[in-house]
C-alpha cells in the first residue's frame, strides 16, 4: 500500500455516531476537515528533513575551526545565509537585518515542501491552499506590523475616505470598504500564486502518469506493456520532474520570498517618505518663524 493510500485511508470505520473519532467529523457531506491527507505527511517529512539538516549543520560547524577545514556544504550554506542577510539589509534596512533568519527559513521551507514530491506518492504541501494561505498570512501580518511601525496612524488613514481642502488631503476616519478590500489583496495574491503554480504542476504530472497507464493497459501482452512503460517513464518522466518539481519548486520559493520582501519594504519606504516630508515641513515652518 502506497503512502498516499495509507494516509487517505479512513482512521475509523465504525458507523456509530457515539464511537466516531475527530477524523470522521464531516460538517458537509464528503468533506472531513480533520481527516489527515498526504499533504500532512509531506509537512511532517519536511519538518524531519529540515531538523536533520540543521543538526548536521550545527555538528559540522563545531568541527570547522578554520576556513581551511570548512566543507563545501558549510561554505554553500554560509554563502546562502550571507546573501539573505545582504538582501534583507538592502531592502528592509540595517535595523531589520534581524529578520534574515526568518527569510532564510521561509525559503528553505517552501523549497523543501515543493521538492518533497520527488519522494514519490506524496503531494507537495504547497499544493494545499490551507498551507499556502498560512504562509501568506505570516507575510500579511508582517505587512501590518511594518506599516504600523513606520507609518503609525498614517497606516490606518489609508483605509479611510479622504477629502482635499486647498490642495491638502485630510482623512475623515470613515472606513473605505474598497481600500480595506485592497489591503487584503497581498494575502490572497501571494497565497494563490504559490498554490496555483504548484498545483498545476502536480495535476500535469498526474495526468501524464494516468495517460501512459491508460495507453499501456490496453496492450494484452503484459511483458511488452511493462517494457514500453519502463522505457517511456525513464526517458520522459525525469525531464518533467526536473522542471515541475525542481526548477518550478525552487523558483516559486524564491518568488514568494522576494514578494514578501517587496511588501514589507513598501510599508517601510512609505513610512520613511512620510517622516521625511513631515521633517521638511516643520523645518520650513521653523525657518519662516526665525525670519519673521
From Swiss-Prot:
Membrane topology, from the record: Multi-pass membrane protein
Keywords recorded for this protein, A-Z: ATP synthesis, Cell membrane, CF(0), Hydrogen ion transport, Ion transport, Membrane, Transmembrane, Transmembrane helix, Transport
Coiled-coil annotated residue ranges, if any: none
GO molecular function: proton-transporting ATP synthase activity, rotational mechanism
Transmembrane segments: 39-59, 73-93, 102-122, 128-148, 172-192, 196-216, 231-251
Summary of the function given for this chain in its UniProt record: Key component of the proton channel; it plays a direct role in the translocation of protons across the membrane.
The protein, known as: ATP synthase subunit a
UniProt organism field: Mycoplasma genitalium (strain ATCC 33530 / DSM 19775 / NCTC 10195 / G37)
Lineage: Bacteria, Bacillati, Mycoplasmatota, Mycoplasmoidales, Mycoplasmoidaceae
GN (gene name): atpB
Amino acid at each position: 500500500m502506497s503512502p498516499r493510500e495509507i494516509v487517505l485511508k479512513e482512521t475509523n470505520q465504525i458507523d456509530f455516531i457515539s464511537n466516531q473519532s475527530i477524523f470522521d467529523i464531516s460538517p458537509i457531506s464528503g468533506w472531513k476537515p480533520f481527516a489527515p491527507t498526504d499533504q500532512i505527511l509531506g509537512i511532517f517529512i519536511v519538518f524531519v528533513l529540515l531538523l536533520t539538516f540543521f543538526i548536521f549543520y550545527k555538528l559540522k560547524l563545531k568541527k570547522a575551526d578554520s576556513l581551511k577545514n570548512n566543507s563545501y556544504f558549510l561554505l554553500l550554506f554560509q554563502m546562502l545565509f550571507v546573501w539573505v542577510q545582504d538582501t534583507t539589509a538592502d531592502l528592509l534596512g540595517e535595523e531589520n537585518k534581524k529578520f534574515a533568519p526568518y527569510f532564510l527559513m521561509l525559503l528553505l521551507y517552501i523549497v523543501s515542501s515543493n521538492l518533497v514530491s520527488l519522494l514519490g506518492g506524496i503531494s507537495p504541501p504547497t499544493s494545499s491552499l490551507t498551507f499556502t494561505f498560512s504562509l501568506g498570512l505570516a507575510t500579511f501580518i508582517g505587512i501590518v506590523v511594518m506599516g504600523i511601525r513606520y507609518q503609525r496612524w498614517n497606516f490606518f488613514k489609508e483605509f479611510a475616505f479622504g477629502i482635499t481642502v486647498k490642495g491638502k488631503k485630510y482623512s475623515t476616519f470613515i472606513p473605505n470598504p474598497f481600500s480595506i478590500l485592497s489591503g487584503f489583496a497581498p494575502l490572497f495574491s501571494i497565497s494563490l500564486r504559490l498554490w496555483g503554480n504548484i498545483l498545476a504542476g502536480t495535476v500535469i504530472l498526474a495526468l501524464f502518469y494516468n495517460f501512459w497507464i491508460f495507453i499501456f493497459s490496453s496492450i494484452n501482452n503484459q511483458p511488452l506493456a511493462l517494457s514500453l512503460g519502463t522505457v517511456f517513464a525513464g526517458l520522459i518522466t525525469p525531464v518533467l520532474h526536473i522542471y515541475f518539481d525542481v526548477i518550478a519548486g525552487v523558483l516559486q520559493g524564491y518568488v514568494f520570498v522576494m514578494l514578501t520582501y517587496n511588501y514589507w519594504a513598501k510599508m517601510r519606504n512609505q513610512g520613511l517618505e512620510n517622516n521625511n516630508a513631515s521633517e521638511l515641513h516643520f523645518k520650513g515652518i521653523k525657518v519662516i518663524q526665525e525670519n519673521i
